[in-house]
A protein has these predicted regions:
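Conserved NAD+-utilizing ADP-ribose enzyme module
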Residues: 2-48, 54-135
Length: 135
């Protein structure tokens, strides 16, 4: 199920998305003023934000921490009508849902972000395990 929120009576409905990210990608988002995702690398044909926070937490904690030493969870809003052009893919269980955005369309996708990209959680290893730092 895709949840949408409404910013105000006159604004368009938005879709809340989350993105697990490592330190390099987060630095590029910060450099954009927290307004845009950086271009994908040549071996990354798809940008895939996820549709629920729990899945983003699992990726940040279980994949990004071992790979990069830190994992972050970001949250952002996108115009819901615009987001419908991209397929939702189930990457595992029923709640493991990703929005698949082709890399060549990421600049346009960024133009439809509403507000700023927010850092909502960070995870770091503690005695061989990961722990939560964030809100």
């Amino acid at each position: 199920m895709i949840q949408t929120s409404r910013r105000s009576e006159t604004a368009s409905a938005t879709l809340t998305l989350w993105r697990p990210t490592g330190p390099e990608e987060l630095a590029l988002v910060e450099a954009s003023g927290w307004r845009a995702w950086p271009p994908r690398l040549p071996d990354q044909p798809i940008f895939y934000p996820v549709l629920n926070e729990d899945y983003a937490i699992r990726i940040a904690r279980d994949w990004n921490v071992p790979a990069s030493g830190v994992g972050h969870v970001t949250r952002f809003e996108i115009e819901a009508d615009f987001a419908t052009r991209y397929p939702v893919r189930q990457a595992g269980g029923e709640t493991i849902l990703e929005l698949w955005v082709p890399a060549e369309e990421l600049a346009e996708f960024n133009r439809h972000i509403v507000g700023r990209i927010e850092l909502v959680r960070s995870f770091r290893p503690v005695q061989g395990e990961s722990s939560e730092d964030g809100e």
